[in-house]
Amino acid sequence: MNSIIKHLAIATKLLNQPVAEEALAANVARDRNLNANIQSLSEVLRSYGFENHISRRKLVEIPSLAMPVIIILHNDEAAVVSEVKGRGEERVYVIRQGDAPAHEVSHKDLEAQYLGFCWFIKPKLTADHRSEL
């Protein structure tokens, strides 16, 4: 779960509205084993001004316009997909994992690690009421 929190923080930074990993971790509810609750984490993101939802879908079904998106990987790992190049099974994904620099991964390689869940996140749009026009 810590990997997911870290990658949600990276995604907020890519959206130019950074929320520190520590802030997310501190505000999320935990169970008896101190594991973070996914629903609580979603609510914390909403409180920071982000619309978000988890979706079960195939890797090729993730829209390239929805970037950045957090993908859930095997072994309690996660990654942020910041860009998608190509189409179908010829796709190449630009991913960020932890503190490593962004790198490209083929569809075949990423699909072998992908659990089938992705977390979409974007800033909430709010009306600007500063002008009378």
Describe the function of each predicted region.
Residues M1-I54:
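Cysteine-nucleophile protease catalytic domains, especially the papain-like/related folds used
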Residues Y48-E51, L59, L73-N75:
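Glycine-rich, N-terminal phosphate-binding loop and its surrounding beta-alpha-beta segment
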